[in-house]
Each structure stands twice: as structure tokens, then as C-alpha cells.
Amino acid sequence: MAHLHALVVDDSPAMRKQLAYALQRVAGMDATEAEDGADGWRKLSTGTYEIVLTDINMPLMDGLKLVGLIRAGGPHQRVPVVVITTEGAENDRRRAMTLGASAYLVKPVQAQQVVETVRTLLRLD
């Protein structure tokens, strides 16, 4: 997966590092970190990413708002978005998928599960 770039959006520095590490070390991708949805949107608006991984509950802008902005149009509207959250309720998953999330994973999540989801969405297998 060399030369592919992911945007990891989560307000937890530890989770951002864990996801970025998995993408970099296990999947061979570059990863940029963003601390909340607003930071993620700024970085997405000025960079090129093949996939976005986002939490839901974050300050300033939550992950669902970010998914909605991505899907509203523009150059990134077709970028796969993986929601990775502690929100395991079916109505939360349904909201995310209705807004346009490509996949929904519930924390705690294993690095291999994240990598497999990314590979599937990017059709790299």
C-alpha cells in the first residue's frame, strides 16, 4: 500500500497514534493525524487522502458532521470514510452509514481489523 495516504481523526492522542502506527507499520501507508473534526476538515481540504478514519465524539466538530461534509460534494466526496468509535448502538451505526460512512468499527479495535477494513475499501486485496 505504499504511496497511499490516510487521515486519522480522533481527539485521543493515544488512539491517533495507535491507528497511525497500524496504517504505517502494518499497511505501509502514510498517515496524517487530526485532533477533531474541524482539524480533520482543514487537513482534508488542503491535502490528498485515499481514506479517512474518524471517531464520532470529538470537540469542535464531531465525526458525523465530518462525514456529512465529505459526502456533501467536492473533490473528496468519494474518499472512503471509516468510523471508529466507542458508540456501539445500532442507531449510531445506522446514522453514520446513512450519512455516507463506508465502514463502522467499534472500539476497542484490533490493528489487523483496521488494516483489513482499509485494504477492502481501497480494493487492495
How should these model regions be labeled?
Residues 58-61:
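Receiver (REC) domain active-site loop signature in two-component systems and cognate sites
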Residues 13-32:
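Two-component/phosphorelay signaling modules centered on CheY-like receiver
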Residues 109-118:
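C-terminal output helix
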Residues 33-51:
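Acidic, metal-coordinating helix/loop segments flanking the phosphotransfer/catalytic sites
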Residues 48-50, 75-80:
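His-Asp phosphorelay/catalytic-motif detector in bacterial-type signaling
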